[in-house]
């Protein structure tokens, strides 16, 4: 490790991968599922099998059963709830007080719902309170929870006004993610094929102020994915750019974060069209935690497979460097990362892949964008075998065109 005067993309990328067990998976006893998720700064989990794979691939010898035990065991170390961007994530149970404080403090954008369908601030608080009361000590399906919420609030909460995948949802569901952010709702084990919800355990940890939680979240993000710019943090958090710029400026003034110079030829995407240049030290600057300026001297080498919505793919920038050349069009969905499982070669996206399951048999189709060397082909075969181990199946590698489109 060294502290360079100018940080290259390859050095920044190598540090990110190293810190979240992608360069070298955690050895047995080094880190469990909760520690791995903590290093990832949450694991997106709307596709359960993909989230299990994200975590399992970062741990040598782990399977999805290790992840499930961390979620649903007698003393769970992971919670499945609504996290960054209002999407479903795994979060470490021990860190839930921090996350609820940070997510509750975060500035949000405009409501996506029609004015007549929105909840007033008082209605929002009433529903969040009702959700917490209804889930205390029990596990409810969405229909059971809906009945409880409407009974505790009023018929207005059950009005079918929210567009859904098939039909309409009741008004109260517009704040389910907020209930998760407030720490009064999380997922529980399925009841058959039905999803259930419960209230997470109350922690004895001291409550963080909104300012403390926000500072810690920014520092955690920069430790995992820095150097980064305010708008990259804002994109990850689904928060307004202006709010993020203000937070970064405040932390910089307090000496909590510092600017480093990124190699100018590698920061085209990072150049800001906004008026943050003076705050960030120039178009080639990005931020790290104060004092965290050492980077690996060697670039990443090797082949990795990452599933849908992997945290590294979503949070790492600049996109044009992580998805170079044809990968930018093939492995992104309208510029959105995570919608395709990706093949990494030497730390950058070099293809896409898809797995189809039939019983214990897994057919893993990998589409490299360029021909792999013999050594890379052997590494790929090993990665496919590891995917099978994590998902408790027997995996077969097929190299060819992936015909499945982007995940919604």
Annotate each language-model stretch with its function.
Residues 1-162, 168, 408:
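Phosphate-backbone binding and catalysis cores of DNA-processing enzymes
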Residues 70, 144-150, 179, 230-234, ...:
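A short acidic, leucine-rich amphipathic alpha-helix
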Residues 72-83, 87-88, 181-190, 253-262:
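A short, conserved structural fragment
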Residues 90-96, 191-211, 281-297:
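Short, cationic-aromatic polyanion-contact patches
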Residues 201-263, 281-283:
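Acidic, glycine-rich loop-and-beta core segments that form the ion-binding/anion-interacting portion
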Residues 255-263, 281-328:
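Non-catalytic regulatory appendages
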Residues 326, 331-408:
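Glycine-rich, small/acidic residue-mixed loop/short-helix segments
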């Amino acid at each position: 490790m060294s502290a360079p005067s100018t940080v290259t993309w390859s050095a920044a990328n190598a540090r990110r991968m190293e810190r979240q067990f992608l360069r070298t998976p955690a050895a047995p006893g080094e880190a469990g599922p909760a520690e791995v998720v903590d290093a990832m700064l949450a694991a997106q989990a709307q596709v359960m099998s993909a989230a299990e794979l994200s975590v399992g691939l970062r741990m040598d010898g782990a399977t999805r059963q290790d992840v499930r035990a961390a979620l649903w065991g007698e003393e769970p170390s992971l919670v499945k709830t609504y996290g960054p961007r209002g999407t479903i994530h795994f979060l470490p149970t021990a860190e839930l007080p921090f996350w609820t404080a940070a997510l509750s403090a975060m500035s949000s954008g405009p409501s996506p719902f029609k004015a007549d369908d929105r909840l007033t601030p008082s209605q929002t608080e009433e529903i969040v309170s009702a959700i917490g009361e209804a889930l205390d000590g029990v596990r409810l399906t969405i229909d059971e929870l809906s009945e409880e919420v409407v009974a505790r609030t009023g018929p207005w909460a059950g009005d079918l006004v929210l567009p859904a995948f098939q039909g309409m949802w009741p008004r109260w569901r517009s704040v389910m993610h907020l209930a998760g952010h407030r720490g009064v709702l999380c997922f529980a084990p399925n009841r058959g094929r039905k999803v259930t919800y419960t209230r997470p355990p109350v922690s004895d940890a001291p409550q963080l102020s909104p300012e403390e939680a926000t500072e810690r979240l920014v520092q955690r993000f920069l430790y995992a994915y820095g150097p980064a710019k305010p708008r990259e943090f804002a994109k990850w958090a689904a928060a307004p750019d202006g709010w993020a710029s203000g937070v970064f400026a405040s932390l910089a003034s307090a000496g909590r974060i510092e600017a480093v110079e990124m190699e100018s030829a590698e920061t085209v995407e990072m150049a800001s069209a906004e008026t943050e240049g003076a705050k960030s030290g120039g178009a080639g600057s990005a931020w790290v935690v104060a004092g965290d300026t050492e980077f690996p001297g060697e670039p990443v080498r090797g082949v990795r497979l990452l599933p849908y919505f992997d945290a590294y793919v979503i949070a790492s920038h600049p996109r044009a460097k992580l998805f170079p050349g044809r990968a930018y069009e093939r492995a992104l969905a309208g510029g959105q990362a995570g919608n395709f499982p990706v093949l990494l070669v030497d730390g950058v996206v070099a293809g896409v892949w898809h797995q189809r399951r039939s019983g214990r048999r897994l057919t893993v189709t990998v589409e490299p964008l360029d021909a792999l060397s013999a050594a890379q082909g052997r590494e790929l075969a090993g990665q496919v075998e590891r995917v099978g181990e994590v998902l408790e199946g027997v995996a077969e590698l097929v190299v060819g065109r992936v015909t499945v489109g982007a995940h919604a």
